[in-house]
Amino acid sequence: MIHDDDPNAPGAPHDDDATAAPASATRAAPAAGDDDDANPLHLRRIRSFVTRAGRVSTGQRRAIDELGPRFVIPYGSAQPDWDAIFGRRAPRVLEIGFGMGASTAEIAALRPGDDFIGVEVHEPGVGALLKLIGEQQLSNIRIIQHDAVEVLAQMIAPDSLDGVHIFFPDPWHKARHHKRRLIQPPFVAQLAAHLKPGAYLHCATDWQNYAEQMLEVLSADPSLENTAQDYAPRPGYRPVTKFERRGLRLGHGVWDLVFRKKHAG
């Protein structure tokens, strides 16, 4: 995910809590030594991230130590009682790859009646979002620090999500790497299976080629329907990041896609 505090973005600031930012948390890469082209089953091993080293700042570490026990849910093979974890029954949205969490926190503050499960593998991003949770006194976010593909399979019940957010996943812009992209038919089918009928899947990217692939893959899934003719206007709840503003000023495009799960029959 590209976010306001990404130090890998052009012109991004380098402060104490930003220097450890992952470039993207929604990166699908094969394990070292895998030969995707020789193994037709490589999609079974798709990951929602790429391993990236990062330094955890003092503020992030403090947030992890102080707030982690309440807001970070350990990965496990059983489905948690999410109503009990959040202390209520409310619409539930899964965000895959929240980066440094600025957009996640802003959306959660804007939508206090909804609960958000953020999945991110990189510890600096987890610490950054926990820091925002503490500063803004947000109670409607929980975090799982693990691969989103496995989280979805093990910890999220079918037909249980009211929404899924995937903002600015790694575009893998070289043609030979397109098979590593997260938005592929098997994963989209898995996402759709965990959405309630009528629930939405919202993807955003600033790479036109990836936007075109997203549109093709999402449109081909028989359980999903597009809410727009092709690309959707940016929903008001999705913040415009500093990186995105710079890109728009330079004439770069951003594409939002919002699909809904069809009702049975």
From Swiss-Prot:
It catalyses: guanosine(46) in tRNA + S-adenosyl-L-methionine = N(7)-methylguanosine(46) in tRNA + S-adenosyl-L-homocysteine. Substrate binds at residues 174, 206, 241-244. Residues 19-32 have a biased composition (Low complexity). Transmembrane segments: none annotated. The keyword S-adenosyl-L-methionine applies. Disulfide bonds: none annotated. It holds the Pfam family Methyltransf_4. Residues 1-40 are annotated as: Disordered. Keywords: Methyltransferase, S-adenosyl-L-methionine, Transferase, tRNA processing. Coiled coil: none annotated. It is an enzyme of class 2 (transferase). GO terms for cellular component: tRNA methyltransferase complex. The active site is at 170. Its EC number is 2.1.1.33. S-adenosyl-L-methionine binds at residues 95, 120, 147, 170. InterPro entries: SAM-dependent_MTases_sf, tRNA_(Gua-N-7)_MeTrfase_Trmb, tRNA_methyltr_TrmB_bact. NCBIfam families: tRNA (guanosine(46)-N7)-methyltransferase TrmB (TIGR00091). PANTHER family: 3-DEOXY-D-MANNO-OCTULOSONIC-ACID TRANSFERASE/TRNA GUANINE-N 7 - -METHYLTRANSFERASE, PENTACOTRIPEPTIDE-REPEAT REGION OF PRORP DOMAIN-CONTAINING PROTEIN. Catalyzes the formation of N(7)-methylguanine at position 46 (m7G46) in tRNA. Belongs to the class I-like SAM-binding methyltransferase superfamily. TrmB family. This is tRNA (guanine-N(7)-)-methyltransferase. It comes from Burkholderia pseudomallei (strain K96243). The lineage of its organism: Bacteria, Pseudomonadati, Pseudomonadota, Betaproteobacteria, Burkholderiales.
